[in-house]
């Protein structure tokens, strides 16, 4: 039984203490990562031994015993490396043989050689046990099949699957590269409130909380837009924020109620400038990660070679559904939606337009800028300079998904107030996603906001694309899952369902 495993491990740890060995030492002097060692010594010939000494640490993932010696693999953030331990070379070989198993976290020190089969290996001279886990590791070949367990116990997923660590390293690299790119462009990274008195900047249902100190209800932000624009009013030319956004909506393979976005705003720019910036940024990321402008996502080649396709929302919907979202009546649009199995409120033209787009969005595979959204669904965007029925707005669509959203930002306070009032009318009609009236934002605009281009990109969806991940929860380290209830620290039922092996001996192979 797995409960017996835990009890045996606790007993073993007590025995270590009785031997004067601290089973949880305070630190370890690690000179190299596994990646450092492999890069530094990749030039060695097969069988070549150096006199260079290294020390590294990590979790033992496998052990192969050979009489009075053993090979084992250590895993850290950067990968795995082989270590070789021999009775005649290692000070505490007997301790290793008797006490160390797969899953233990250890530190090793020794010289480096390349095995006869060409694998960089550490010949261990000194060895230290750093942690002995109380729980067994996932079985090597079967691992965890239950996705809910993977998401809930991501730490186990990371231990078992090297690809998981690689994916989250890439996420970190992508965010770092975005920051580096924008810094070189002269953008300042700023911070805006997560707790807000009003929500704005997007059409979404917010999470509500209560601030005891002031005895008022507050909201978790659904966007950073309105506060970032206040920076532009105040005199910043270029600002951005990378942070968490919260929307009390559904969960799907491409939606998550808590997600990460970047919004940026540039004074004296418009949506054409934002299109160019978006192309440049994402192409830069693709080239930095893959050395090319073409990647494969879910078996489909995606080509980021510039310039990207540009198409008007009106034209694309008319081409695919035969309805004109600018000229046709509400009744005509409602009829087309009904023919496609979508029932809507005929009094909400903006909602009908969004539903029509939903029907055709997945037809767009290659990077495409969808342009000129109607005013009804773009309350914060400037009206188009040549056609006031639409706005200077674009969405970037890749593989049937919105990746970015951008405007020539509305900076006319009278027009902005009028659009806010229209949003209030929609709220009165029951649309809980319509935007609230932010009077302070209107007041800020009355002080004067220069012509401004704004851009928002969903970081999680971007990481999905760049890591070939099918589900948004695969790129969020600790996504939302159903609560599992009270956890009995000695209960392994959740792990038994996930095919965790029952015997320690099965690991030592």
Curated annotation (Swiss-Prot):
Its cofactor is Mg(2+). One of its GO terms (biological process) is lysyl-tRNA aminoacylation. GO terms for cellular component: cytosol. It holds the Pfam family tRNA-synt_2. Coiled coil: none annotated. It is found in: Cytoplasm. Keywords: Aminoacyl-tRNA synthetase, ATP-binding, Cytoplasm, Ligase, Magnesium, Metal-binding, Nucleotide-binding, Protein biosynthesis. GO terms for molecular function: ATP binding; lysine-tRNA ligase activity; magnesium ion binding; tRNA binding. It catalyses: tRNA(Lys) + L-lysine + ATP = L-lysyl-tRNA(Lys) + AMP + diphosphate. HAMAP family: Lys_tRNA_synth_class2 (MF_00252). Homodimer. This is Lysine--tRNA ligase. It comes from Fervidobacterium nodosum (strain ATCC 35602 / DSM 5306 / Rt17-B1). The gene is lysS.
